Amino acid sequence: FPDQEVIDRTWVNTWQDENVVNVVKATGRKQLIIAGLWTEVCVAMPVIQAAGEGWDVTVITDASGGISKESHEVAIQRMIAAGANVMTVMALAGEWQRDWARTEHVEELTEILIQHFGGSGIAYLWEQQLLNT
């Protein structure tokens, strides 16, 4: 995100940093999509706090990782109990695209599928070549 301003912060819980929260609020959006390393700390802490404040928070579980499988899974359980939604990257991409007739972002989504979704991305590329689209 080269055009994004870096926010220098000291809080472990990002959502405790007023500068971060103000930047998010300024977007006017009501839904947060969060993923990151150390699911049990860097993801769970802001998710639980933001959900508690009434934000619609979704955690992308397969784009997050904890120090162990157990800590990742326990953090996910905590976030669900706090009111967060969970989904995978592929589910998120599908919900955002919804209809392949919506062509405005198909090229970008196709690149993401090819680069990051292994066999699914290759299958999609192959299908597009067969359909000559």
Residue ranges, per PLM feature:
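Active-site-adjacent betaalpha module
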Residues: F1-T133
